[in-house]
Every structure is written in C-alpha cells, then in structure tokens.
C-alpha cells in the first residue's frame, strides 16, 4: 500500500476493505498515519471504543473518538479504525476532513465507499454508486420521509412507494439505501428504516412465489 501513497493523497475518501486472504488491518493503520504525516494534518482516530485503538502504540497517543465520547475536528485526517455504523455517525457533518476507513467486517462499508466515491486501496479503483439523477431523487425522498424517524404510518407508506420505484427501475439495493440514509440519520433511526425494508422485501418475495389468482393451479377443473 505504501507504493500507492501518491495516488491516495489525491483523494478525500480512502477505503481499505477487509482482506480475506491477506492482512489489510495493519497496512491500513500505516496508511492512515502516512496520509496525516504527508498532509501535515491533525489525525483523529474514530473507533467503537478506546480499547480497540489504544493497544496499538501508534494510535494510543492520538485523539480517539468513540461511540460514547468526543467528536473529530473538521479539516484534519480521520482514521476510521474498524468502525461500526454507530461511531460513523460522528463523521456525518465533516466537510473538509480526509477519511481513511479501515474495515473490520468484509464489505460492511462497501456501499459507504461507493456513495463517497472513495479510492479503494486494494483494487486501485475509485468506487462509484452509479446513481442517476432520478434514482438519487428517489433516495433523497426516502431520507426526507425519515424526518421524524419513520415513526408515522404515512412515513412507512410513502417510503414503501419509493422502494417500489427503485425496484421497478432495477435499482433496489438494500445496503445502498441504508448507506444513503446513514449520511444524515442516526443508527437508532436506521433500525426503523430496516424494518420497512424488511417488509418491502417480504412483499417482493411474495410477488414472485404467489401464483396469479386467475391462473388455474388445481387439477380439479
């Protein structure tokens, strides 16, 4: 990964996906430190809890933001160290920071990286969600319906309608919908959106498995 540093420095979002055959955790840590050093920028570690970072001597001496405490300073470099969705709420409103995300669970933050146009240090590619203006508008509609946390029946009905639009366009992607909402919503709220997605997916499966009521399925005609 060190050979890619010049390319990495061209990007604001850097994604280190969890490797299944080779170690990406330690190289990801070194990459985050190198990005901050090359940019002469303040480095903040964002991690689920302090213990997940402090047993690394290089990270223990840095500012560590956790699910329970702190917020990163905007304008520096953030090392999202094996983060959870919950702790990633802390970077939602950072407008100028460079984010290096080192993933723990394989592909957990793939949708996040696609939405952010992140540079994937494993593949050497800039990721892209490939959203058209129309699909982006539908996703924004889903987020807007969550202004009260998807707590009302009408919120659910309208959201289900938007999800049907995505499915009709062949653009329904559960993880992408959740990642889009996570750009501005809390994880507590996201749990309610997940239930709506579950309901939608169940209804979609029933459309596939339930025969048309007008089609004769009995041999007793």
Each model region followed by its residue ranges:
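Short, flexible loop motifs at catalytic/binding sites
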Residues: 1-221
């Amino acid at each position: 990964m060190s050979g890619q540093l010049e390319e990495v420095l061209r990007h604001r979002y850097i994604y280190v996906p969890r490797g299944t055959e080779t170690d990406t955790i330690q190289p990801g840590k070194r990459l985050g430190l190198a990005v901050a050093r090359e940019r002469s920028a303040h480095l903040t570690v964002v991690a689920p809890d302090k213990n997940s970072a402090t047993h690394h001597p290089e990270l223990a001496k840095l500012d560590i933001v956790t699910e329970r405490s702190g917020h990163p300073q905007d304008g520096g470099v953030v090392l999202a160290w094996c983060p959870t969705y919950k702790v990633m709420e802390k970077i939602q409103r950072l407008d100028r920071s460079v984010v290096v995300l080192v993933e723990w669970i394989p592909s957990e933050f793939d949708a996040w990286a696609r939405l952010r146009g992140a540079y994937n240090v494993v593949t050497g590619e800039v990721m892209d969600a490939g959203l058209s203006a129309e699909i982006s508008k539908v996703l924004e509609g889903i987020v807007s319906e969550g202004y009260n946390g998807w707590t009302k029946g009408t919120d659910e009905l309208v959201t289900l309608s938007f999800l049907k639009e995505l499915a009709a366009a062949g653009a329904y992607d559960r993880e992408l919908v959740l990642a889009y909402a996570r750009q501005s919503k809390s994880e507590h709220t996201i749990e309610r959106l997940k239930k709506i997605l579950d309901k939608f997916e169940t209804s979609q499966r029933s459309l596939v498995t339930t025969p048309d009521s007008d089609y004769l399925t009995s041999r007793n005609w």
